[in-house]
């Protein structure tokens, strides 16, 4: 009886200890993303071409702003182990920004957004 009590008592903690090794990203970008650049710079996460194998769906959309620049929105949607962990980050790119600076801005936003998921993995200390 005592053993059964302890099993029932600690069952929620056993399920919380489910191990998430790495963030697996499906990048869904309809706005000037350099996916190869992101993959080279962010080797601590895995990029997938199939959203069913990922645990994080990142949707990137952009639009022209009234000043001639761009407003780019990154939506981070948790899948599977990260279900319910969703975030949105936006960057405003000025009209005279170089292509290289622009992709570095995007990389910075992507890194910041993915960090919220990395800290929930067992790989967090290796980043």
Predicted regions and their residues:
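Short helix C-cap/helix-to-loop transition motifs enriched in small/turn-promoting residues
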Residues: 7, 51-52, 67-68, 79-85, ...
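Pro/Ala/Gly-rich low-complexity, hydrophilic intrinsically disordered segments
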Residues: 101-127
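Bacterial Sec-dependent N-terminal signal peptides
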Residues: 1-20
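Amphipathic beta-strand/beta-sheet edge segments enriched in Tyr/Trp
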Residues: 56-106
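Start-of-domain marker
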Residues: 18-67
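Generic hydrophobic secondary-structure signal
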Residues: 5-9, 25, 38, 42-45, ...
